């Protein structure tokens, strides 16, 4: 991070809440502009450099981890009635379990069991076989959008809980277990790791999160490549201010049904 960037951060902090909100809004807009113009990654640092640039200190990382777990545990208790209602709705809507568990890749490339509500039919592979059988080349993967608007695999309740992000609520279990953070790049499936470039693997140097800069700015409407670019920006510039901005922005996104990026 340049001295000028640090100076802007200090100026915003001195300006009070309004300055902080304005700084975050400008940051988010700048991020979207750079994605649109393809200006991300023009001079990427080394993989170890990503670890140095992030503005959390080692002590800050520990505090963040404790806060994540405490807030996630409190959140699970607070929303337990909602979890029960969603689980019952899923079971009544289609055969199969209420929860979906899948292996995802976490910090330092370690696999973990990922929890979310099931939003698809249990025979999803049979309903959309071409998605699983087709062999994409690297360029096709970079341009993929992984949530097609008319997906035959998704149930009626699944469409609702995906649109409202209720399907992600069980991710709080992963935060309590220490596999995930509240904010961070979304955890990847093992099959897509070969498509990550060397620099993009820096995304795995931090814990994956329930929400992310990419989810906030693009929700499900940006490509695999654009998601990676935003994840890399988060790894490079993450801080308490950014995490709070992403959290509050996510609440706004869920409430309005729109991403910050439009």
Language-model features, listed with the residues they occupy:
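A hydrophobic, helix-centered structural microdomain
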Residues: 55-127, 240, 245-262
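Cytosol-/stroma-facing membrane-proximal "stalk/adaptor" domains immediately downstream
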Residues: 190-208, 213-215, 219-246, 254, ...
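Short, glycine-rich, amphipathic interfacial segments at transmembrane boundaries or analogous
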Residues: 40, 99-152, 211-229
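Short, solvent-exposed loop/helix junctions and linker helices
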Residues: 56, 60-64, 147-151, 162-166, ...
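Hydrophobic alpha-helical segments characteristic of transmembrane helices
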Residues: 43-45, 169-176, 216-219
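N-terminal hydrophobic signal-anchor/signal peptide
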Residues: 1-79, 201, 234-236, 260-262
């Amino acid at each position: 991070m340049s001295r000028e960037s640090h100076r802007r951060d200090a100026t915003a902090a001195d300006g009070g809440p309004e300055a902080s909100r304005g700084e975050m809004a400008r940051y988010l807009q700048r991020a979207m502009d750079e994605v649109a113009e393809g200006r991300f990654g023009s001079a990427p640092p080394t993989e170890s450099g990503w670890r140095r640039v992030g503005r959390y200190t080692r002590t800050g990382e520990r505090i963040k981890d404790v806060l994540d777990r405490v807030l996630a545990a409190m959140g699970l208790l607070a929303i337990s009635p909602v979890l029960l209602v969603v689980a019952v709705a899923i079971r009544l809507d289609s055969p199969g379990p209420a929860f979906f568990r899948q292996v995802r890749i976490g910090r330092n490339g370690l696999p973990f069991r990922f929890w979310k509500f099931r939003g698809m039919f249990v025979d999803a592979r049979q309903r959309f076989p071409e998605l699983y059988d087709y062999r994409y080349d690297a360029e096709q993967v970079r341009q993929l959008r992984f949530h097609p608007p008319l997906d035959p695999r998704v149930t009626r309740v699944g469409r609702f809980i995906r649109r409202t992000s209720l399907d992600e609520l069980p991710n709080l279990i992963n935060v309590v277990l220490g596999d995930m953070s509240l904010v961070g790049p979304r955890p990847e499936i093992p099959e897509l790791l070969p498509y990550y470039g060397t620099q993009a693997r820096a995304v795995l140097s931090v814990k994956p999160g329930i929400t992310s800069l990419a989810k906030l700015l693009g929700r499900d409407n940006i490509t695999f490549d654009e998601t990676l670019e935003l994840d890399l920006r988060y790894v490079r510039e993450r801080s308490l201010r950014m995490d709070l901005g992403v959290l509050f922005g996510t609440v706004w996104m869920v409430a309005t049904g729109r991403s910050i990026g439009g």
